[in-house]
């Protein structure tokens, strides 16, 4: 009976975090209590967040929320690139690529490897953002199209 309750609490906890809408531990506590887990408090939620490796990251609405690592789509060598790239935008001189957390350096290295022959002068990568500088005289729209074709392949 106790294990069943613990398992259902863990399942409810993981389900809540997968919604990516909880920005504080107190919000998670309230949601779990509304689901019938009245014995849950902030310290219990804090221990669960640590145990399952939850982190705070930005969701699609740019809000800081808790989520579990498997929701972060941590890249591996079998991940299709299109699953790691969230957005490609540009101005007249620079391309900005938004990726899943942890994927930017992997993708930037790939872009650097195709290099000048494809019109890429260089890249700068953080955790989830890449700045791509095109070579002089290159049509930025053509470069974006080439980059997007590259993302259709896998690593």
UniProtKB/Swiss-Prot annotation:
It is found in: Cytoplasm. It holds the Pfam family Arg_repressor. GO terms for biological process: L-arginine biosynthetic process; protein complex oligomerization; regulation of arginine biosynthetic process. Keywords: Amino-acid biosynthesis, Arginine biosynthesis, Cytoplasm, DNA-binding, Repressor, Transcription, Transcription regulation. GO terms for molecular function: arginine binding; DNA binding; DNA-binding transcription factor activity. One of its GO terms (cellular component) is cytoplasm. The keyword Amino-acid biosynthesis applies. Pathway: Amino-acid biosynthesis; L-arginine biosynthesis [regulation]. It comes from the Bacteria. Its main location: cytoplasm. HAMAP family: Arg_repressor (MF_00173). Regulates arginine biosynthesis genes. Belongs to the ArgR family. This is Arginine repressor. The gene is argR.
